[in-house]
Amino acid sequence: MTKKVGLLVMAYGTPYKDEDIERYYTDIRHGHKPSEEMIADLRGRYHAIGGLSPLAKITEAQAYGLEKALNDAQDEVEFKAYIGLKHIEPFIEDAVEAMHKDGIEEAISIVLAPHYSSFSVEAYNKRAKDAADKLGGIHIQAINDWYKQPKFIQMWADRINETAKQIPAEELIDTVLIVSAHSLPEKIKQHNDPYPDQLQETADLIFDKVAVPHYALGWQSEGKTGEPWLGPDVQDLTRELYGREKYKHFIYTPVGFVAEHLEVLYDNDYECKVVTDEVGAAYHRPPMPNADPEFLEVLRTVVWDAYTK
């Protein structure tokens, strides 16, 4: 009989419909209800990208696509995917409970974010472990990060090189690659959190494989908390680089994200483009991984390597 293993795929979550926006935002704010102004601002950003974020459907396609890729590649183990979200149902705890009800005793978990941070991935893993410990009978093996997987680096390099082909050859010298991820509060540095170094390493590994001659590291989508966050912000970085180097082309590559959602469709495609338009440079962004076969193969390799090591 084939062994059955739970595949817990964790992600941030997004509102499914307009009525979800307030409770979703309240959850992000640890139970503090947002002001009407804050809700209107978030609703306005969703409106600017054409409605609600496509993230929910993409996360589903990634989770079930990964399940299929794992099961198609071997017949020793049957993986069963469960989606657990941080800020909306099905919550991480709901997914662990569903595994428990299905009689799953062994599971492997992956967060749909390649870099580890005590602030993000560790919080997901802790919630999953706490839920499993409370129910008893489920052992979850957690994957902490997967940014160094060679197929992940190659996937981004290929996408960047394809994007660079749209730029006239003689202007490639005036092109810069902006590699970015979600900013986090600066206080994580006090605890030697590996997150900033992991992003730097990702940028270095990708830059080694691309035809673009310049690159810079930026942060984006910081929270409105009043405390300092990791910088430079990608918009400030764009202005600074243009002012100093007069680059004609900016290729934005938000490698900390794996799907087209608000932070990419608004913070990059709208806000960064506003800045490139302002300075007279061209905006470019390679397609996000979403549930593309190359990305499902990245995830399959990550999970299978972790499971079999």
Swiss-Prot record:
Name of one Pfam family that matches: Ferrochelatase
UniProt KW keywords: Cytoplasm, Heme biosynthesis, Iron, Lyase, Metal-binding, Porphyrin biosynthesis
Record's keyword annotation contains NADP: no
InterPro entries: Ferrochelatase, Ferrochelatase_AS, Ferrochelatase_C, Ferrochelatase_N
Binding locations of Fe-coproporphyrin III: Y12, R29, R45, Y46, S53, Y124
Keyword Disulfide bond: no
Superkingdom of origin: Bacteria
Molecular function GO labels: ferrochelatase activity; metal ion binding
NCBIfam families for this protein: hemH, PRK12435.1
PANTHER family the UniProt entry points to: FERROCHELATASE, FERROCHELATASE, MITOCHONDRIAL
Family listed: Belongs to the ferrochelatase family.
Name of the protein: Coproporphyrin III ferrochelatase
Organism: Listeria innocua serovar 6a (strain ATCC BAA-680 / CLIP 11262)
Gene assigned in the entry: cpfC
